[in-house]
Amino acid sequence: MTVAIHTRALHKRYGSHTALHGLDLTVQSGSVFGLIGPNGAGKTTTLRTLLDIIRPTSGDITVLGASPRAGGAALRRRIGYVPGELRLEGRVKGRALLRHLAEISGPVAPGTIEQLAERLGLDLARPVRTLSKGNKQKLGLVQAFMHLPDLLVLDEPTSGLDPLVQREFLAMVREARDAGQTVLLSSHVLSEIQQAADDVAVLAQGRIVAEGPVSSLRIASVRRVRATVTGVAAETVADALAAASGIEDVDVAAAGDLVRVSATARGDIDPVIRAIAAGTIRDLTVEEPDLEESVLDLYARNGAAS
């Protein structure tokens, strides 16, 4: 698999403030890569350096095999971009604006603009200035997707969209990936990353604090384990859990012949299973962690909770 985006030792400073601290990032072609982080983590700065909107203080960047600075207009035509703060010409109608942008971005197949607008529920006949924030966001999505770019760079792309349109957007992202396009998706809506991304990087204070498949973040997270066991004393189970590593919020209670156990496991749940295995396990429930829990836990452990 080829690499669509690669950064090495990427730094960006604004005076005395350092926004990016030596960012090393690799995005494989034909994948959806999620970038998660709180406000001020460096997500937008990262995207803008990839597009040569701002220049890094130091470090190397390669996008679609070229330097963003040297690639110029030819490289930009291969990229679809939705900025976090969308500014559109308000004096024209949506259809006219998109046709004008199509002349800049490159060939757009006949009917594509209308098809995308229909999927997103966008009225192209209305002047842009009369559109709501959500409908302006739909315009931004259409202009990014309409020329079938090799790379989609999407900064908080569902801002202002209702749940049904968000679902359609996620379908568009998956279709783009299936067609061989690469998608870099920056979002604080963690369910989007969970549903759409193959891999993810978590940014905190300009640094990557975790990176890998979305499933790996779930594994690293906190899980709640509940069990009912027999044939063992509650004190024995409680002592075993107290001696195990990575186990928190333990609650062990006897109820007749039953012992009810509840505990939080950080990462692997095996220590909990071992602790209750002295008895007969009658019931066992493991609450699979949501990505949101994983990310909040990572923020907390890296002093970057927001």
Feature locations, PLM:
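Structural motif
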Residues: 149, 245-248, 267, 279
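Hydrophobic alpha-helical segments typical of transmembrane helices
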Residues: 97, 112, 116, 236-237, ...
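Alpha-helix N-cap/helix-start and coil->helix boundary motif
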Residues: 11, 95, 190, 234-235, ...
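ABC transporter nucleotide-binding domains
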Residues: 2-7, 12-210
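C-terminal coupling/interaction segments
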Residues: 264-306
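ABC transporter nucleotide-binding domain
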Residues: 169-264
